[in-house]
Amino acid sequence: MKNINPTQTAAWQALQKHFDEMKDVTIADLFAKDGDRFSKFSATFDDQMLVDYSKNRITEETLAKLQDLAKECDLAGAIKSMFSGEKINRTENRAVLHVALRNRSNTPILVDGKDVMPEVNAVLEKMKTFSEAIISGEWKGYTGKAITDVVNIGIGGSDLGPYMVTEALRPYKNHLNMHFVSNVDGTHISEVLKKVNPETTLFLVASKTFTTQETMTNAHSARDWFLKAAGDEKHVAKHFAALSTNAKAVGEFGIDTANMFEFWDWVGGRYSLWSAIGLSIVLSIGFDNFVELLSGAHAMDKHFSTTPAEKNLPVLLALIGIWYNNFFGAETEAILPYDQYMHRFAAYFQQGNMESNGKYVDRNGNVVDYQTGPIIWGEPGTNGQHAFYQLIHQGTKMVPCDFIAPAITHNPLSDHHQKLLSNFFAQTEALAFGKSREVVEQEYRDQGKDPATLDYVVPFKVFEGNRPTNSILLREITPFSLGALIALYEHKIFTQGVILNIFTFDQWGVELGKQLANRILPELKDDKEISSHDSSTNGLINRYKAWRG
């Protein structure tokens, strides 16, 4: 992968000049000038997904210049580097191969000269055998009863991805009840343990090293709770499995290493749901549906790695994001799924994007002088319309939005879905085109009111519009289409990282807080006054000690 400061490229300079020409052009102007705009600025993927990016402040010239930027930053070379197993995560000297986990073509992918696919397939087969035993009831707990509940204990990528997918694919779930514990706050695991029976519960402990503080604290609490009922430590093996590579620690915990599902250092945490970390997904929806999830992602991988930039959906979305972030000064992006099953999708890509591209040092080790990753946030529609859309419509900040919805609902109840989708379509139209003062005044006249007598309120009812959006319409949310959608966003993030000249696949920003917490923890064991920190931290710790009793 080449290390190129994007602002030093000819394409960036051309984009800056183009922005000066485009900054006052409105979306309404663009549609007025081109009645065929939708067909030019939208694309369908696999007859499963329609991506409409026409309601953006872009022209064909904008996209051409953005694609020039991608070429100058050697995006094509970077894609080849990732897919070929090159160690593009240089700060950790690791390959980045979540694409291998869903490589349904089974073509060889080499890391250090070794094909990783046989090991990937072996773990998948092990997940299949294990999950079928649990789901069928063949696997029995220590009292001879079948498993009814599965508790996934993990944090970050070991929690967010599996939780998001099991929720999004709830229509495909079987009889097993799924629970997720992540927070080291004892409340989280306490509330889950109130809902389950030790005789019929399986715990999945998801930690590559089996040393993650939050995960292992929760795992030991779960083990203690279990042993209060089961008594004999030998029963742990029937109720705990590990998603880890540390066989020694797993065995010491009491887990049979035959029930340890491994993954590799080329699997990043926030890209790990495709690996053994996805065992909770397999247990929830069955192995065949998990394979469909992998297949959808693999289809998007093929699209991303083989399609020219001008038709490449992850690349197009990435370039449009850079356009807003670096030229229009937009600091955030909202992800707004109009599907309640997708209620964790924005949170998942909050981690996926912000932990990947929230970096201020470039691949050369220099502090950047441009914007890198945006702030990602969002909630399901229509809830968000009654919460924060006010700011998106009439606030002073530009918030580019992705609207996501399925054409077919899993719950065709009365006219609910038509009402949901009417809002989905209406919001992007309102954001793009707004409502002028003239229209507001005419509405008053149509109601038999004199606008002059209501002059004071008219400005508050004006919508400027010109707020950019992408619309992603899925045929239906299925394992396949969800896999493709997740991979679409993953590759968008990768593309932006390449162009912004940052390392997308490390996360050193999480380390300092952990180090300081490990230093502070022993200081909380007694009642001595603390003076080893700054005055604020000392004051907080000492007040905590005084109040805890």
UniProtKB/Swiss-Prot annotation:
Signal peptide (from-to): none
GO molecular function list: carbohydrate derivative binding; glucose-6-phosphate isomerase activity; monosaccharide binding
Documented EC number(s): 5.3.1.9
Main location as per UniProt: cytoplasm
GO cellular component, one term: cytosol
Recorded metabolic or biological pathway in which this protein acts: Carbohydrate biosynthesis; gluconeogenesis; Carbohydrate degradation; glycolysis; D-glyceraldehyde 3-phosphate and glycerone phosphate from D-glucose: step 2/4
Record key words, sorted: Acetylation, Cytoplasm, Gluconeogenesis, Glycolysis, Isomerase
Active-site residues, record numbering mapped to chain: 355 (proton donor), 386, 514
Record's catalysed reaction(s): alpha-D-glucose 6-phosphate = beta-D-fructose 6-phosphate
Keyword Isomerase among UniProt keywords: yes
One protein family per Pfam: PGI
Residue list for modification N6-acetyllysine: 80, 228, 234
Keyword Cytoplasm: yes
Protein's cellular compartments: Cytoplasm
One GO term of the biological process aspect: glycolytic process
Family (UniProt): Belongs to the GPI family.
Purpose: Catalyzes the reversible isomerization of glucose-6-phosphate to fructose-6-phosphate.
Database matches in PANTHER family: GLUCOSE-6-PHOSPHATE ISOMERASE
Protein name (database record): Glucose-6-phosphate isomerase
Species this chain originates from: Shigella flexneri
